[in-house]
Amino acid sequence: MDQDIKTVIQYPVGATEFDIPFDYLSRKFVRVSLVADDNRRLLSNITEYRYVSKTRVKLLVETTGFDRVEIRRFTSASERVVDFSDGSVLRAADLNVSQLQSAHIAEEARDSALMAMPQDDAGNLDARNRRIVRLAPGIDGTDAINKNQLDTTLGEAGGILSDMKDLEGEIHDYIEKFADDTSVVRGVAWVYNLGSANGGENVITINKPTRTYAVPYIEVNGSRQEVGYHYQFDLNTQSISLVKPLEKGDFLMAMTTESSVPLESMLASAAGASSVGKLGGGTVQDFITNTESKFGSFSVLEDFGPVGTPEDTAATLLSSLSSGKPIVLTRMYSLPMRTFSIPSGTTLIGLGAKTGFKAAGGTELFVNLLEVGGTDVLLSNFAITMDAAGRGSVGSVACYGVHFLASSRGNRAQGLKITGKAVGSTVGFTHGVRCNGVRNVVDKCDIQYCSMGITLRGEYHKITNNYLNNHYVDENLGPWTAASMFWDGITGEGCINCEISGNISEYNGQSGIYFGGNNSLSQGLIITNNICRYNYNRGCDTGISGTASDTNNVIDVTYSSNILENNRETNLWLFGVSESTLIGNHIRETALYDTLFPNQASTTRAGLALGGLTCNNNEIVGNNIRVRSTTPFGIVLNGTGHYLAANRRIGGASNYIFASDNQRLVGNSIERYTGSFTPTLVGTAGINVTSATGRYEIQRNVLTVEINMTLSANGATGAIAIGYIPGLSSVTPVMRDIKVTLLNGWLPALGDKTILAREGTSNDLLNLVVFSYGNQSNEVAQYVGPASSLRITATFNTSATL
């Protein structure tokens, strides 16, 4: 039997283009995925990969976290490629396609069977060294068991703790509860039967060395149960009577109020770990020792020295960083405004926004408060406050909160709250995070009052789920100038294959997101699912400075599914950018715009704009553009080679694409653009135009025109030429499907003669001719009466190559 898998292939990551080795009937039957042993991501055509040819695809996304690219054919069994109807003509090609679809479905079914869990030669099921997932718990003695059952059997109780920070925090909580009352201990957790019920129990007894006075509530498998409704507590017997019996394996935790015993004795007792809500029993020290052996020990900063003055804290921080241990920050520490270098492998974790560092003083510029030049550094869950007190400028930065240097690789700033202004002070020129190097991550950071929130340069960075606001707009700081301390939320130059997604950037002094050349090359950027609103300049601003070249350019950028709202100037702006895709973005102006920017000139406003002569070959598809009535354009179009399709536009001026008709028709490929014009008579004497209207539609390089005119004359002679047809002045059109309809009012002398339209003396003119019995004449004016109406419809193909 043929055992080859023919409809699925996996390639190792590392390349960007991959062959499709099988035939298929439709691209929608081909699925491209990124695959790892424990993860799978199905990619979307156009936005995450595209077809280079019928047999080859190109990835548009980063493959970090995955080791294989899978291409699979999955032919629909319900969506027929060919649908036969009674009475129709059967063609061999249709029958072949229908038979091929059935063959593809059968071939894919065979491959699925081969890829499932087969039997070996002895009849045993063979997992072929792969994990078996979603395995139900075993019941009978011969059943397979899953890892959770094994962990419970071995006493690991389902994963006790992720790190020492949780343990320390919970112990502190219980210490505070002990300190509240010297006679009674409140809020002590007790876990029944080491965290796993036997099953069937409806009465359980609290067997603790201290007397329990009350049980305010219990939790069963994380579901809170209320006293008097779900259970009763008997003080005399120290028992809990449940309305619903426990099931086997249930986790029951009771929150108790009990008599006090010395804290040291309780924590050192055999039930000490259980007393603070941990499974498995044993003393707290036993639990700490066991956890350290699994996860490594954490230390608090104070373990390494005094933290009273900024200089004390500086020395202690340096000492802790040289220890090689993960450091926990338990409060806000004052530091001098100077650079602190973080070694590779350091983990620096806070306990939230009320822990971290506040730096002030000094006169130095270009301070890197937390400087990372190596690898595998984690900065997580703490605050940084920089008090630069008005120092610095855009070219002389006072301080960077976190600076990943060009030598850095694979570091992470996560959950940081970074503020560029101390209470009562003024803003100096600061960057929240400066991200250079390769494959660094800035995630879920809250960055406010920094001149620039996040700035980046390098390769494969991920800037995700951050909040950026320097409060220039919402605090009404006046007209912006280049000397301002308030710039963009996210700024990138010289960025390759970076992802900027899920960020909110608002109220900034310049743009929400800016990427530019500035003598550098940026390409392969994925900018998606961001919200950029209320910014003083633009929502998303991408462009080059100076002359475009191989080393000074912005190319191959994908803007998708972003929300760009009420930004002062153009919401989505590309200047000199080429080979890029703008798809599915939501651009809107609301009544709030007039409140935020009441005096803004309409000439600087548009929903989406492409500018510059080097702005070429971009795709603008499926964008939703809603602008105010005072905004003149939904789309501004400069450059050539662009493809525009399925963009929805509401509001603004009627001429929603600002461009010449020649640009719309010839220089670019535009789907279903409609417009109007006023036709005139050219070089014709003795005839008056009573009324004239013209409508046209551009569908790529095809122009469809309808002209309606009413003419009046008395004894006129000569030819009639009508112009000017939009977009045709500089091209040689091929006219087809032309029709002249004489509506009424033509003189009887016309008789059975026919009036036709022919190409005029220039590309954008039509000449009317009289045709009769094979003879053609230009003498048409003699048949025009006091009110002669006609309609002309025509279709033109341009000869230009798009």
UniProtKB/Swiss-Prot annotation:
It is found in: Virion. It comes from the Viruses. GO terms for cellular component: virus tail. Keywords: Degradation of host capsule during virus entry, Degradation of host cell envelope components during virus entry, Host-virus interaction, Viral attachment to host adhesion receptor, Viral attachment to host cell, Viral tail protein, Virion, Virus entry into host cell. InterPro entries: PbH1, Pectin_lyas_fold, Pectin_lyase_fold/virulence, Phage_T7_tail_fibre-like_N. SUPFAM superfamilies: Pectin lyase-like. Its main location: virion. Coiled coil: none annotated. One of its GO terms (biological process) is symbiont entry into host cell via disruption of host cell envelope. Transmembrane segments: none annotated. Functions as a receptor binding protein (RBP) and probably mediates the attachment to the host capsular exopolysaccharides. Displays a depolymerase activity that specifically degrades the KL47-type polysaccharides of Klebsiella pneumoniae capsule, which allows the phage to reach the host cell membrane and bind the entry receptor. The N-terminus anchors the RBP to the virion. The central part and C-terminus probably binds and degrades the host exopolysaccharides. In the N-terminal section; belongs to the Teseptimavirus fiber family. Homotrimer. This is Depolymerase, capsule KL47-specific.
